[in-house]
UniProtKB/Swiss-Prot annotation:
Protein name: NAD(P)H oxidoreductase RTN4IP1, mitochondrial
Reactions that this protein is recorded to catalyse: a quinone + NADH + H(+) = a quinol + NAD(+); a quinone + NADPH + H(+) = a quinol + NADP(+)
General function of this protein: NAD(P)H oxidoreductase. Involved in the ubiquinone biosynthetic pathway.
Localization terms from the record: Mitochondrion matrix
Source organism of this protein record: Drosophila melanogaster (Fruit fly)
Keywords: Mitochondrion, NADP, Nucleotide-binding, Oxidoreductase, Transit peptide, Ubiquinone biosynthesis
Gene Ontology CC, one term: mitochondrion
Residues that coordinate or bind NADPH: S228, G230, V231, S251, Y269, G353, F355, H398, R400
Pathway(s) where this gene product acts: Cofactor biosynthesis; ubiquinone biosynthesis
Disulphide bond pairs: none
Amino acid sequence: MTAAGFNSILCLRQLVRLNRRQYSAPAKSVLSGSQTNDQATPPPTSKSADKMRGWQLHNYGDIDELQLSEMLKIPQIRCSNECLVRIRATAVNPIDLAMLRGYGATVLNKMRCQPGDGIEFPLILGREFCGELVQTGMGVSLPLGSRVWGVVPLQATIGSHAEYVAVPSYCLAPAPKELDDYEAASVLYAGLTAWSGLYITGGLGGPCGATTASGGGAHKRVLVLGGSGGVGTLAIQILKSQKVQVLATCSENAIEMVRNLGADLVVDYNNPQAMEELCKYAPYDIVLDCAGQGGQKAAESKYDFRQYITFSSPLLANIDKQGLGVGALKNVFDLFQTNVRSVTQRGGLVKWGFFSPAPQGIQFLQKLVEQRKLMPLIDSSYGFSELPKAFEKMKSGHLRGKIVVKLREETGD
């Protein structure tokens, strides 16, 4: 990121912080006292204290299916590596909107094989958070009271759109001091999606890039489609931190913002003449589709590439529509057919990228934040009682960064 771009992002950050203060109402404390040991014993001491607020889903459908419940049971730790977190801030991601409509239900229900996880409803959405560690299993070394950031596995029935969440210890880490609660709650889901696509699926840094926090990819050339969204903005910063040449597409009114993130060339995807410029830099080592175009569009590109990685795969949708067996076969056929066209016309492979809650990915992102090479962009912020409005904002599209939701006041730790 350039110095001028970094200063511009800092100015935007200050404006967002000023605008969000009206939503910062403290939530009630439901834990009495503090726990000094690391064993998973029930934290509350009264019947009223073991309850929490959360947004539940009892049927798949539209945003009006979300219901705020005031007396939900706080999740219990069931394994030695689990952690209970009191949430201060969370975020709304495209996957939340998709899961609200039933996306991935067939596969995710099969994955809910632990006792108590096999029930589909009620479902609490939310994939990432920043909060306070209030209880741990005996195998967790993080101290209680730690400020942490983390993600929630997709198959979990209790997500982060509630006051408390329980997750495996590999899904969280100490939150960077460089970020406030809002910012820390907005990094990991999109950041791990971008990191996984580039380093696990794309092999950008070789074997070490996928298995460690080393990163890599210097002097490669990557085209980011949809550079102004949650995944795109973080992908650009990740790539530039590793000395990768980055080109990006976005709408005309987001060009300056994306350029400030460090992209070497930014073009308006609605301008055919500008899009022609991308052909001059081909072939690309990776085309990273953060715009939801899907692999079918790869062969229609006017530029060559070695890999086209899309986060909009039909994998879960095919299984939802046709069942596990037939859907799996349909996935194999779709990927094969897409790659035949892609290799024939553009010379490269199409791959599907996915979110991965890998601890080495969290460590990599944490390192970039601490080095001030990665800063999340906040599109808008909402209070917890306004979560449906946050979903409406997500549904409207054309975001400039992430949508965040605040549950608690910051404590300055």
